[in-house]
Regions:
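Beta-strand-rich, non-transmembrane domain signature
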Residues: 1-221
């Protein structure tokens, strides 16, 4: 794709599907996602199995998404916004599913993905589809102390990397603890280069590419 200033960029789509199961008689959670002028949430659904025609249970969109500014300042505002569901569970074993899709208008802003979240998970699967025209570096951090399986397969005109982790505990919050990037396993995405109409475009292959990007951002600023 192309950015607002007509530069060639790699666009990315992040699709998420989560099944939530209540382990208490009465519980409530809030599922949220942030976006801004560089990203766009194209789908945001809360699904539950309900009886439809002929008694067949199907997933129906039952959630009401709230969309608001993520900035609370009375003096400064930015383009950060948040979309979220308030999800309630009426009893033990209640289940609901959330499915979302977010588009990154420039893949530079899709930096990393983590296996852990605030809620424990029986299974976490991260699947990355890399088209043939894209040179993407998947950098694995803090994998050594965790049992994470990795599989590489091919589909039509793309390579698929599948990471899987079982029995994932929830994130721990500790006072004055170091950032999760130093302790929890995650994958960092680095676009090294890509082909556009037969022409090779640079991403972040080395420090020089990063410097050129910073220089471009600096030149765009108005003092």
């Amino acid at each position: 794709g192309r950015s607002e200033d007509k530069r060639s960029v790699v666009m990315a789509t992040r699709s998420t599907g989560i099944n939530f199961l209540s382990l208490r008689e009465s519980a409530g959670i809030q599922y949220y996602d942030f976006y801004n002028s560089f990203t766009k949430i194209t789908s945001f659904k809360q699904l539950e199995k309900m009886k439809g025609m002929f008694g067949v249970k199907k997933n129906y969109n039952v959630g009401y998404a709230i969309d608001r500014s993520a900035s609370s300042s009375d003096y400064f505002s930015d383009d950060s916004r948040v979309k979220y569901f308030n999800i309630g569970f009426s009893g033990y074993g209640d289940a609901t599913r959330v499915e979302t899709e977010k588009k990154y208008l420039d893949s530079k802003y899709l930096t990393s993905v983590y296996f852990h979240s605030f809620y424990p998970a029986k299974e976490k699967i991260i699947r990355v589809k890399v088209p043939d025209w894209l040179e993407l570096d998947l950098r694995e951090y803090n994998f050594a102390d965790y049992k994470i399986t990795k599989q590489k397969t091919t589909e039509k005109n793309m390579t698929v990397y599948t990471f899987k982790m079982l029995n994932v505990p929830g994130l721990k919050s500790e006072s004055r603890g170091i950032g999760i990037a130093y302790t929890y396993p995650h994958i960092v995405f680095v676009v090294k280069s890509f082909s556009n109409d037969g022409k090779k475009e640079n991403g972040f292959a080395d420090v020089g590419d990063l410097y050129n990007w910073y220089k471009f951002l600096y030149q765009k600023t108005v003092n």
